[in-house]
From Swiss-Prot:
Involved in the biosynthesis of the central metabolite phospho-alpha-D-ribosyl-1-pyrophosphate (PRPP) via the transfer of pyrophosphoryl group from ATP to 1-hydroxyl of ribose-5-phosphate (Rib-5-P). The keyword Transferase applies. It comes from the Bacteria. It is an enzyme of class 2 (transferase). Its main location: cytoplasm. Keywords: ATP-binding, Cytoplasm, Kinase, Magnesium, Metal-binding, Nucleotide biosynthesis, Nucleotide-binding, Transferase. The active site is at residue 202. SMART domains: Pribosyltran_N (SM01400). Its EC number is 2.7.6.1. Belongs to the ribose-phosphate pyrophosphokinase family. Class I subfamily. Its cofactor is Mg(2+). This is Ribose-phosphate pyrophosphokinase.
Length: 321
C-alpha cells in the first residue's frame, strides 16, 4: 500500500469485469477501496451497469482492459463511461492496460477499416477525459485521440525482473526483437540490461502464421531474451525461439507485456525451446491459457503511481522510462 491519504478523498477507482484482480491490487496500492458498482447481463446479453455510490464531483478512474472477449469488455467500458458522465463525475479517466483492436491501426489492404481509430472515437464520444494506456501496439494510436493519453511502458518492469534473476548474467545475454517493428522496445530492454541486441527477419505469409527467415546479430553461446508487446497464438515467438536455439543460443527466454495467448498458444509454448515465459498481468490469464513455464509480473504499482500523479495534477512523464 502506498499511503492512506486518499481514503476520504474525491479519488474513486472502479473495476469492470476485464481484470478485477489487477484493479483490486491497484486500489490496495493507492490505499482506497474499489468503488461499488454492479455489472450484470440481461437474458438477451445486454449489459446493465449501476454505480452504487455517489461520484458527483469526483475524479473517477475506470480500470478495464479490452481483452478477450474484446467486444464485451469494450461495451462495458463505454457504458461505464456514460454512467459516470450522467452521474456528474468531475473527471472520467480510463485505465486501459490492454487496448483491444490496436493491431488494426492502419489500412493494410484496400477497403479495410482502421478499427483502432473507431474505438478511440467511441471512447471520446462516450465521455472519457483521459486515458492511461500500457504498451500500445502502435504508439501512433495516441494520435487517434483528442484527449490526453499517458502511455506507460512495461519494459522497465521486465528489465527489473531480469536484473534480479540470479540465473541470468546480463553479460552473457542478448536481447532479441522478433521483427523489425519491435527494435525500439528491444533496445530499451538492452539498455537496461546493458546487453547487445539481435533482430529476427521474418515474413508472414498469412495472418497468425509466421516464418522465421534470418537472424541478425551474435547469438552463439548467449542467453537469448525475446521481447514483444503481444503474444497471441505464439507462432512467431516459438519459431523465433527454435531459430535462436539452432543458431547456438544457450537458453531462450520470451517476454511480453500483453499475454493474449489465444488458440494453440499454451501448447506451442510448452512444447517449444522457450525456457521461461515472462508476462505482465495486464490481461487476466486463467489456467487454461497459461503455459506451465510462465512467470507473471505485476503492473499494479506502475498504474497506481500513474493514477496518483494524474489525481494530484503532477507530471506522469517520470513513469514513461
Amino acid at each position: 500500500m502506498l499511503n492512506n491519504e486518499y481514503k476520504n478523498s474525491s479519488l474513486k477507482i472502479f473495476s469492470l469485469k476485464g481484470n478485477e484482480p489487477l484493479a483490486q491490487e491497484v486500489a490496495d496500492r493507492v490505499g482506497i477501496e474499489l468503488g461499488k458498482c454492479s455489472v450484470k447481463r440481461f437474458s438477451d446479453g445486454e449489459i446493465q451497469i449501476n454505480i452504487e455510490e455517489s461520484i458527483r464531483g469526483c475524479d473517477v478512474f475506470i480500470i478495464q482492459p479490452t481483452s478477450n472477449p474484446v467486444n464485451l469488455h469494450l461495451m462495458e467500458l463505454l457504458i461505464m463511461i456514460d454512467a459516470c458522465k450522467r452521474a456528474s463525475a468531475a473527471n472520467i479517466n480510463i485505465v486501459v492496460p490492454y487496448y483491444g483492436y490496436a493491431r488494426q491501426d492502419r489500412k493494410a489492404r484496400s477497403r479495410e477499416p482502421i478499427t483502432a481509430k473507431l474505438v478511440a472515437n467511441l471512447i471520446e464520444t462516450a465521455g472519457a477525459n483521459r486515458m492511461i494506456a500500457l504498451d500500445l501496439h502502435a504508439p501512433q494510436i495516441q494520435g487517434f485521440f483528442d484527449i490526453p493519453i499517458d502511455h506507460l511502458m512495461g519494459v522497465p518492469i521486465i528489465g527489473q525482473h531480469f536484473e534480479n534473476d540470479p540465473n541470468i548474467d546480463p553479460e552473457e545475454c542478448v536481447v532479441v526483437s522478433p521483427d523489425h517493428g519491435g527494435v525500439t522496445r528491444a533496445r530499451k530492454l538492452a539498455d537496461i540490461l546493458k546487453t547487445p541486441i539481435a533482430i529476427i527477419d521474418k515474413r508472414r505469409p498469412k495472418p497468425n502464421v509466421a516464418e522465421v527467415m534470418n537472424i541478425v546479430g551474435e547469438i552463439e553461446g548467449r542467453t537469448a531474451i525475446i521481447i514483444d508487446d503481444i503474444i497471441d497464438t505464439a507462432g512467431t515467438i516459438t519459431l523465433a525461439a527454435q531459430a535462436l536455439k539452432d543458431k547456438g543460443a544457450k537458453d531462450v527466454y520470451a517476454c511480453c507485456t500483453h499475454p493474449v495467448l489465444s488458440g494453440p498458444a499454451k501448447e506451442r509454448i510448452e512444447n517449444s525451446a522457450i525456457k521461461e515465459l515472462i508476462v505482465t498481468n495486464s490481461i487476466l490469464l486463467d489456467d487454461t491459457r497459461k503455459p506451465s513455464n510462465t512467470k507473471e509480473l505485476s503492473v499494479a504499482g506502475l498504474l497506481a503511481q500513474a493514477i496518483i500523479r494524474v489525481y494530484e495534477r503532477e507530471s506522469v512523464s517520470v513513469l514513461f522510462d
